[in-house]
């Protein structure tokens, strides 16, 4: 009888658990030209954290600085800046500097909640005339 009771309680706990649905970004692939620009990644749920997963560029991305406060989370390096405004946590601002190299730049941005994540790949095309 005791085992049956424990099994029933365990099953009830499983059925009453809240399962988080995954956060979803509006766009998962964004291709932009070489000019300096800002991109807004919109999400359907509140974003708790941002990160960049990887980058492929002529500039080393391992020198990224991460800092934050109660109002913003910021990640930046030589050619990009990610900003999550905690007062409006449904979007991430991605600021890209002009791509003066002869290679495309690729940046994967990850947004997350407690346990779920979503990613967007941003490709900044190379400068068609790198001598400019």
Which residue ranges define each predicted feature?
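Surface-exposed binding patches on compact interaction domains or structured appendages
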Residues: 38, 43-93
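Bacterial signal peptide processing site
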Residues: 18-21
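C-terminal edge beta-strand
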Residues: 29, 92, 115-132
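C-terminal motif of bacterial Sec signal peptides marking the signal peptidase cleavage site
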Residues: 13-16
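Sec-dependent signal peptide recognition
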Residues: 2-8
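Ligand-binding face of N-terminal immunoglobulin V-set domains in extracellular IgSF glycoproteins
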Residues: 89, 93-96, 106-110
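A short beta-strand micro-motif common to beta-rich folds, especially ectodomain repeats
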Residues: 101-115
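Post-signal peptide N-terminal segment of mature Sec-exported envelope proteins
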Residues: 26-43
């Amino acid at each position: 009888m005791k085992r049956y009771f424990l099994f029933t309680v365990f099953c009830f706990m499983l059925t009453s658990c809240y399962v988080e649905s995954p956060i979803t970004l509006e766009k998962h692939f964004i291709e932009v030209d070489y000019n300096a620009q800002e991109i807004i990644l919109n999400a359907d749920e509140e974003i708790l954290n941002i990160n960049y997963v990887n980058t492929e560029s002529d500039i080393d991305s391992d020198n990224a600085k991460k800092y934050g406060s109660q109002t913003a989370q910021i990640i930046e390096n030589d050619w990009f800046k990610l900003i999550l405004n905690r007062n409006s946590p449904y979007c991430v601002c991605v600021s890209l500097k002009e791509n003066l190299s002869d290679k495309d730049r690729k940046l994967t941005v990850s947004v997350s909640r407690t346990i779920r994540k979503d990613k967007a790949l941003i490709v900044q095309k190379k400068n068609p005339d790198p001598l400019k």
